[in-house]
């Protein structure tokens, strides 16, 4: 899941279950100088690379705990954007995305995702996305709904929508262009770990 990096950072590194409190000091969205490659379990999309690993990049003596927390949130959002770009390159027009589960409870992360992807983010009522997806496919397979789109409209209840802010989306576009350079630069090193 996308939020597994957030959970790892909060629980294993920061030693807290209160990730919301760790996000509170984050003030300057789109202006962080630290990047995080969120490939803690390798990467599957769009870089099919089981050797890829997580990396913090750009830290200095001025880097704070909040900067690193923000980098984790942004890194996962940038990786989601990578997949969005693949869809766009195939001619698929995407104007909004849907999120659910634990990560969807963070107002800050929802805002980051909306601005990094520069599309609307619909938050679903359901907690377990894979279970909902399985139920939707089963319902289509059994003929309850004619297709996945119809099943989604009936079963995936939207409880909140977060829209990108033009100023923040522009800042995140610049940061995303830098993020895209990191994986190709690191790829040769991953195999040597």
Question: Where are the model-predicted features located?
Answer:
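Active-site core segments that coordinate phosphate-bearing ligands/cofactors
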Residues: 1-193
């Amino acid at each position: 899941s996308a939020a597994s990096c957030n959970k790892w950072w909060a629980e294993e590194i920061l030693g807290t279950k209160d990730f919301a409190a760790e996000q509170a000091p984050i003030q300057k969205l789109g202006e962080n100088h630290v990047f995080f490659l969120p490939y803690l379990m390798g990467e599957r999309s769009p870089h099919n690379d089981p050797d890829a690993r997580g990396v913090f990049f750009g830290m200095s003596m001025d880097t704070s705990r909040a900067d690193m927390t923000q980098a984790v949130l942004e890194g996962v959002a940038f990786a989601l954007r990578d997949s969005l770009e693949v869809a766009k390159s195939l001619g698929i027009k995407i104007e909004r995305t849907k999120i659910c589960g634990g990560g969807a409870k963070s107002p800050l992360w929802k805002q980051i995702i909306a601005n990094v992807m520069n599309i609307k983010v619909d938050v679903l009522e359901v907690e377990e996305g894979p279970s909902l997806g399985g139920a939707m496919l089963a319902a289509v397979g059994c003929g309850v709904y004619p297709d996945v789109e119809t099943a989604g409209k009936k079963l995936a209840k939207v409880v909140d929508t977060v829209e990108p802010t033009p100023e923040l989306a522009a800042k995140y576009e610049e940061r995303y262009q830098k993020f895209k350079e990191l994986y190709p630069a690191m790829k040769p090193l991953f195999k040597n770990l």
